[in-house]
A protein has these predicted regions:
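Active-site beta-loop-alpha junctions enriched in small/polar residues
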Residues: 31, 83-85, 145-149, 325
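Short beta-turn/strand-loop junction motif enriched in small, turn-promoting residues
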Residues: 41, 53-54, 177-179, 275-278
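Acidic/His- and Gly-rich active-site-bordering loop/insert found
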Residues: 2-110, 133-137
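Metal-dependent amide/peptide-bond hydrolase catalytic core
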Residues: 2-6, 30, 190-340
Length: 340
């Protein structure tokens, strides 16, 4: 069947199937943790089968199910990607409706993961099924991945390393983006700083013992000084960043310049500090977790080395390590545009 682009869009606009699909996805819990996506992957498989598309459910770990389906032929290859798991619906949250109700009311739909990202997942899945009924040029792959909320090791990363169907010319990711098209996101590097001291009774502070918290306090300004480290642009990545900044300016209004500049520099958030057991004991240990976000042109290894050099100039006893080693899929936070 051949259908025009306009007819396809009109058909989607007149059909309530997308809303119904999203409601059904919301009624299937896929909280992570624990991360069990068996039921939602099975539902998607049946949904695609109902549209004449065979999908493969890939279990990478007990309870961790991913789903992949490919249609079409040819060299040009677009991948549609969304994740199946959601942030947990925690006890004590002020829900006005049950979190797995999929309730549609007054032009809105309610449920855990409606925004992140079962809304995007439903849109990709629905369009994939619709396009499968048409004659189109090239290949189209749908991937529903798991484990996104806890790092992706058993979801997207596993599939990228094991399944060539995910290696397309481009990927359209359904993550919420403020209704603007985004070309990527800043790389996240979570770094742990650890200081060791020597415990003693608090009444002897300054005479005996070594306060690990104070050791950490002295180096935290050095960590924060990495805030604003500028990106290292090529001509291409500078041009792409400027395009995305235009979207930020439109989205954030009067704060546009400030918000847009976040794409040009490193951000540093000293997120957690742990240390000490009682206020009358000199703390023997202190741990700080730092969330750094990288612009184009700066690698995880480079920012960690910058931090380590600054810290060790003042206190070489501070341990600097990864919370979880970054999973490198490409050598940069940006891999360049394709030829097509």
């Amino acid at each position: 069947m051949t259908i025009s682009r306009n007819d396809l869009i009109q058909g989607v606009n007149e059909d309530n199937g997308l809303v119904e699909l999203l409601a059904e996805l919301l009624m299937i819990p896929s909280d992570n943790p624990p991360g069990d996506t068996t039921a939602i992957a099975a539902f998607i498989s049946d949904y695609l089968k109902g549209h004449g598309v065979e999908a493969e459910v890939i279990v990478t770990k007990p309870g961790i199910a991913n789903i992949v389906a490919t249609i079409g032929e040819g060299d040009a290859h677009l991948v549609l990607n969304g994740h199946l798991d959601t942030f947990p619906a925690k006890v004590g949250e002020e829900w006005t409706v049950p979190p797995y109700s999929g309730l549609v009311k007054d032009g809105r739909i309610y449920g855990r993961g409606a925004g992140d990202m079962k809304g995007g997942l439903a849109a990709l899945l629905y369009c994939f099924a619709k396009i499968s009924q048409t004659n189109f040029k090239g290949r189209l792959t749908f991937t529903g991945t798991s484990d996104e909320e806890t790092g992706g090791e058993w979801g997207a990363l596993w599939l990228l390393n094991k399944d060539d169907r995910l290696h397309g010319d481009a990927v359209l990711n359904g993550e919420p983006s403020g209704l603007t098209v985004r070309i990527g996101e800043k790389s996240r590097v979570s770094i742990i700083l650890e200081a060791e001291g020597k415990a003693a009774h608090g009444s002897f502070a300054g005479y005996v013992g070594v306060n690990a918290i104070m050791k950490m306090v002295r180096i935290l300004p050095l960590v924060e000084s990495l805030q604003g480290t500028p990106a290292v642009f090529t001509d291409e990545t500078r041009a792409l960043t400027e395009v995305v900044m235009k979207g930020y300016r439109k989205q954030y209004g009067h704060e546009s310049e400030t918000m847009a500049n976040v794409l040009k520099e490193v951000t540093v958030n000293i997120g957690t500090i742990e240390g000490g057991s009682e206020d009358n004991i000199i703390p023997a240990y202190c741990k700080v977790t730092v969330d750094t976000r990288l612009p184009l042109g700066i690698t995880p290894a480079e920012i960690t080395e910058m931090m380590k050099v600054k810290i060790h100039e003042v206190d070489p006893s501070i341990k600097v390590s990864w919370k979880r080693p970054p999973q490198i899929v490409t050598e940069s936070t940006y891999s360049g545009t394709g030829e097509r």
